[in-house]
Amino acid sequence: MKAGSLKRWALAPALAIATAAALALALVASPVAGQANTTYTVTVENLTTGQPLTPPVVVTHSSDIDVFEPGQAASSQLQALAENGNNDPLLTLVGSSSAVYDSATGTAPILPGETATISVEAPAGSLISTAMMLICTNDGFSGLDSVALPASGSKTVEVNAYDAGTETNTEDFADIVPPCQAVIGVTSDDEGTGETNPALAENGVVSAHAGIQGGTDLTTADHGWTDPVAKITLTADASGLPSSGGPPLDDGSGITWALYVAVGGALLLGAGSVVLVASRRTVR
């Protein structure tokens, strides 16, 4: 074999390595490469006897975003939900984030003892958060805080009540959204409000709710609760699971696929080395 031919054969292993590395890096850079979204059914059951819940906001996302975080100040979007039952600002916020895969909301309040079902999609390894107002409170809410979605089957989580820390708990109908009186059946001359009152600003953080204290319009007998306030079941739709025909998917990092490519590159490298050695022996 001529020297030029030997040089070309010597380049084969290097080309195999470069090709494998490029493919591996491309897959690692794309977290959901080769993955299909799974459809999840989210079922929310109201476990209270006197607290209707607003239609839940449901969000599937990565670890790069928090819908809420205990111990931290609530966002203005969460404040709108917790004080006024207004989901729109939060839906707009998550809808503009690249860390969010899908979001949805219910269509009607969930009365005590009732359930609601919402569907969302997410790739493997995703998290889910939910938020819904406890209607007969100043700024109470409940929900899931960045819970890992099941790869298959179902997962059930019971959730407690949170205080958004944005409004003083006056427990006065004048400061509470109007549906409270109509739904529970305890009424007064105060119509209630769906607007934030700056005079009641608390400037606190998200924390465990102390519950209804009574003594004004809200009563422990009619509006009180004991935790948990809701049960949330997350069910992966078997018909929407990623195909099992190829190599197993990882948790969303892309590393498993990259390993397959790297192994393929190593095999190409080995083949190139064998050909090179054989060629050298032929020349001799």
Give a label for each model feature.
Residues 25-36:
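Sec-dependent signal peptide cleavage junction
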Residues 56-58, 68-70, 82, 89, ...:
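Extracellular low-complexity, O-glycosylation-prone Ser/Thr/Pro/Gly-rich "stalks"
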Residues 250-264:
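Juxtamembrane/start-of-transmembrane alpha-helix segments at the extracytoplasmic/lumenal side
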Residues 35-39, 47-156:
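Structured domain cores in non-transmembrane regions
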Residues 263-284:
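C-terminal membrane-anchoring or membrane-association module
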Residues 237-254:
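C-terminal low-complexity, Ser/Thr- and acidic/Pro-rich disordered "stalk" regions positioned immediately N-terminal
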Residues 2-18:
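Bacterial N-terminal signal peptides that target proteins for export
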Residues 13-26, 266:
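Bacterial N-terminal signal peptides
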